[in-house]
Each structure stands twice: as C-alpha cells, then as structure tokens.
Regions:
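C-terminal and inter-domain tail/linker signature
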Residues: 22-278
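N-terminal leader/targeting signatures
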Residues: 1, 9-11, 182, 196
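Gram-negative bacterial Sec-dependent N-terminal signal peptides
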Residues: 3-21
C-alpha cells in the first residue's frame, strides 16, 4: 500500500509539474501571442481571446475592465480598424509593442501586456493621432530601425535610462544630457522635435507656445530588451495631465533614437474602469 501510494504521489507530482512547465512561455511565444491578439482588433478573430486570463486588469481608461471589455472591443472596433506592429520586445513577464493603428483615424500607439504563466493578465497603452507631416528633421513617428540587438546589454541600457530620467528628466540637470545622448547622431521622431534635441531643447511647434508647460512628474515603469528601452511616465503637457511613453534606441551606452506617444489622461468621472492609467 505504501509503495502504491508513493507511486501515485509521484505520478501526481509529475502531472502537476508538467502542467506548470507547460504554462511557461518563451519570450518569442509571448511576443507571438501579443501580436496575434493585437491583430484580432483588425480581423475580429475571437480565438486569441483565449490568451487572456480571468483576472485581466485593463488600464485603457476607455475600455471596460476584464476579459469582457476586450471581447467587446474585438467584436465592435471602430470601422476600418487596422493594426500593424512595428516594434516589439519582451522583458520578463512583459511584452511591449509599438503599433501603427487606424483606430477611429490614423494613430500611433504603445501597448504593454503582462503575463502570468501562459495568460495575459494586465494591459496598459498610450495612443496618439498621427502627425500631419514629418517633423522638422523629416522623420515620422514610426520610421527607423526595428531589429532588437545587443541582448547582453539589456540591464545596462535600462539602468542608463533610469539614471537619465533621475538626473535630467525628473532632476532637471540639463547639463548632464551629454552623458546619456549622442551629441550629433540622435534621431528624433516626436512630431515637433528635431534631431539632436530633446523636447526640453525644442523651441518649434507647440513647444513655442507662450506659457507652454511640459513636465514629467513620475516614472512608473522602465521596460527593455537589448537596444530598446521603453519608459512609461506621467506629468503635464500643455498644462494637462498626460501619460508619456518614450521609446529609446541605445547604441554604445548612448541614446541615438527616440520615439514617443503622449496621451491626455481624462478626468476620473470619464473612466470606464477604476484601475487608473498606470
């Protein structure tokens, strides 16, 4: 009886461990699931909804919480919706994607998903209208390199961006910009931005507006893989509460490229869930 019990216990342990191992996805598998789920907004294919966990937390303030909110969005997207993922990377349980949308009009967006095992359990995003034209340096919000490289430098590049935000963006030490950014090879994709300048240094477009207020107040997440690092922050833009998603490409421990999406955070009485933007 003891031997039989031991065999049964070992068998159950094997099944349990096997199920746990089966639930773990590789970074490539997570990326594939996110790409497929995003594409379902265009195709209205409901099968990718199986990737979503029952505890799914939604931070898009215009979408209802839980799996039901995503299902409704897939079933009834704005007419003519298209989704093309331009850049995507995985960082632990997170996958971050930069997307070219037609979603009630041409838009650019970042989507961030958190996995628990093989299920997607949380989502953040930021969406912005496409620029009417390329910026003063001739760049769009999406062009530029897309390949993830320098995988061995992931941690160092994330730390670089943390220090940059601590020192320069939040700390206001503008004299330290040169420590973090290429002086003559920084490609800027912000609608009003110019190469070799940050928003703090730009004086054209909306940045030239009298009384213009542009301020970061808090960094919520720093995600990265290889040469790409995404910083998710909040602050004020044109004196309005704003979510900032800034994507940087790092080369030789310097910022060499920047893409961003800015979205005004609506008043809480307009939210369709109570989870907050971050």
């Amino acid at each position: 009886m003891q031997k039989r019990f031991t065999v049964c216990a070992l068998t159950m342990l094997s099944i349990t461990c096997g199920a746990a191992l089966a639930a773990q996805l590789t970074p490539a598998q997570r990326i594939d699931r996110v790409t497929t789920l995003l594409k379902s907004l265009e195709t209205r294919d409901l099968r990718p909804l199986a990737y979503i966990g029952s505890s799914y937390t939604q931070h898009n303030l215009q979408v209802a919480d839980g799996p039901a909110g995503v299902r409704e969005l897939v079933l009834h997207p704005p007419a003519g919706t298209t989704v093309h993922t331009v850049r995507i990377f995985a960082d632990g349980d997170y996958v971050a994607a930069q997307n070219d949308y037609n979603f009630g009009g041409p838009k650019v967006g970042f989507d961030v998903f958190r996995f628990d095992g093989d299920k997607i359990v949380e989502h953040w995003d930021n969406l912005q209208d496409k620029c009417a034209a390329p910026n003063p340096s001739g760049r769009t919000q999406l062009d530029g390199p897309t390949k993830v490289t320098d995988f061995d430098k992931t941690d160092a590049n994330k730390l670089l961006m943390k220090r940059y935000f601590d020192d320069v963006v939040l700390g206001g030490q503008r004299d330290k910009i040169a420590q973090y950014r290429s002086a003559d090879n920084f490609h800027q994709h912000n609608c009003d931005g110019e190469d070799n300048k940050s928003g703090f240094q730009t004086k054209t477009g909306i940045f030239a507006k009298p009384g213009f207020v542009f301020k970061y107040t808090k960094v919520h997440k720093i995600l990265g893989q290889g040469n790409f690092v995404l910083v998710m922050s909040e602050g004020l833009f044109d004196a309005k509460p704003t979510a900032f998603y800034d994507l940087y490409r790092i080369e030789n421990s310097k910022q060499v490229e920047h893409w961003d999406v800015l979205e005004t955070i609506p008043p809480s009485d307009q939210w369709k869930n109570s989870n907050g933007k971050f």
